[in-house]
């Protein structure tokens, strides 16, 4: 990506340290939210996220997964209304790379927080970008509930953030706690049945379990 920054990129760069960036996005009109999906949000972007792109979301226990029910927690989707629900674009990465990255994060967190309940990698869910974009509100007139943005990550030596051109965010576009809960249910209904364990070749943690 080169040239003048888009409004979308300006917004996401200005809110890079804002853990409520999706809430900030909710302040914009629907037409702006949707238009920004057609603009690059990062200087290292490989291009905007198209409807037919396959996306991958990984899940950890106990943050996202409920052992008692054997399924994803509703709160696993809270990030969509806050910092953004991080996903990887499978056109720009591999399942093995996602599994190894996710496993490294889990192992790193456990090493730094040995005094807390330890986390484990549960698996992943695959879905097309258009499936998130096709979720509509129940009220009339129905409107788009989620946007998918190509928030490719730039390496940052100061924070230790690794570069990741496959990174994208699913953001909830509708404000309000009641709407948020209903929409989280819709996303869980979409992704929970697709929860798949990483194979040994996709995750170092799986191979050592």
Residue positions per predicted region:
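Conserved NAD+-utilizing ADP-ribose enzyme module
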Residues: 2-53, 74-85, 91-209
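Fungal intrinsically disordered, Ser/Thr/Pro-rich regulatory tracts
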Residues: 57-63
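Short aromatic-glycine-(Arg/Gly/Cys) micro-motifs in beta-strand/loop hairpins
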Residues: 63-77
